């Protein structure tokens, strides 16, 4: 896990869960119905 991300990089999270900065929410891929939590490089 990453303290910056609040979630594992690339972790699938519920669609209404907001990824914490400095992250952004990837679209529904590759997790149908879910968002993918991504860290900025």
From Swiss-Prot:
Disulfide bonds join 5-37, 12-31, 19-38, 26-39. The keyword Disulfide bond applies. Keywords: Disulfide bond, Nematocyst, Secreted. Expressed in tentacles. Its main location: other. This is Peptide Hact-SCRiP1. It comes from the Eukaryota. Peptide with unknown function. Does not exhibit any effect on human ion channel TRPV1 in a Xenopus laevis oocytes assay. It is found in: Nematocyst; Secreted. One of its GO terms (cellular component) is extracellular region.
């Amino acid at each position: 896990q990453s303290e910056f991300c609040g979630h594992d990089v690339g972790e699938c999270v519920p669609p209404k869960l907001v990824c914490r900065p400095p992250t952004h929410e990837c679209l529904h891929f590759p997790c149908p119905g879910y968002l993918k939590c991504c860290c900025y490089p």
